[in-house]
Amino acid sequence: MNDEALLNSTPKDEGEAPEAKENDSKSFTLTGSDKKNYEFTIIFITSKILLQAREINDISDFIYKTNFSLEQLYKLNRFFMLYENLDDIFKFFTEIEDKDMSLKLDNNNIIVNLKCKIMRTEQNIEFILLR
C-alpha cells in the first residue's frame, strides 16, 4: 500500500469500524532497540485509529536527526482494524512479549517497526509517521 492510500484508508476498508468514542485514548510506554523509552498514546478520531508517539529520553536529539516536531501522529497498520475497541488494542500492547521497537527514515517518513511475540508467535507491526 502506498503512503497516500495508507493516509486515506479508513477502518471500513478493512471491515467493521472500531467501537470507540471520539478522542478516546490510552497511553503506554515501550523501550526501543536504541534503549530509549517512547511514550505512545492510541487515539480514536472519526473512526480512524491513530497512534501518537513521544520520545521521553533525548528528545532534542531525536528531533534534530529526523526533522520532525514533538507532536506527531502515527497511524496504526491495518493489523489493528481487527480489534473491536480501544481496550482490546491496549490489552494487545500490555500483553505482548519481547517488545523491541526501531525507527527508520524512508522517503522523509519515519517508519516505526515493532517486533514482538504474541502467544509465542513472532509479529512485525509497522506504523508510518504522518506529517
Place the predicted regions along the sequence by residue:
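A structural signal for beta-rich interaction modules in eukaryotic proteins
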Residues: 2-130
